[in-house]
Amino acid sequence: MNLHELKYNEGARKEKHRVGRGHAAGKGKQAGKGQSGQLKRTGSKPGFEGGQNPWYRRVPKRGFNNVNHIEYQVISIETLDAAFPDKAEINPEVLHEKRIARNKNLPIKLLANGATKKKFTIKLNAASKKAIELIEKAGGKVEVI
């Protein structure tokens, strides 16, 4: 027996049944959808609950979502001090390589938690005023890209 001569066992594979192709095909007329009605059509929209007040209208709402809000990955000076040697160049690519910043889609912001005496050259999407002040006080440089 060769590989191309292999066959499935009898009844192991069912043939696909094409519905709505006439009586002779076996699944004609109503095509397994029952009698004419709303659910025989292409379907209702997502979230439709048959006329009952849908979930997204029953649940109370609070506040609002600011369209212009930017979510940052925050990184502290303390973290950079522990992870990098003196005079290191720090940018988003390096932070992703070292797995300090996990999400490549979010911008990175430097915060002033902790302190450092190392002279870093930092290029990030955002930094707090205090963080910039601390890095420059240590002799480093911060550039917002």
UniProtKB/Swiss-Prot annotation:
Q: Does the keyword Protein biosynthesis apply?
A: no
Q: Where is the composition biased (Basic residues)?
A: 14-26
Here the segments flagged for biased composition (Basic and acidic residues) are 1-13
**What is one term from the GO cellular component aspect held by the record?**
cytosolic large ribosomal subunit
Q: State what protein this is by name.
A: Large ribosomal subunit protein uL15
Q: Where is this region: Disordered?
A: 1-56
Q: Which family does it belong to?
A: Belongs to the universal ribosomal protein uL15 family.
Q: Which organism is it from?
A: Mycoplasma mobile (strain ATCC 43663 / 163K / NCTC 11711)
Lineage summary? Bacteria, Bacillati, Mycoplasmatota, Mycoplasmoidales, Metamycoplasmataceae
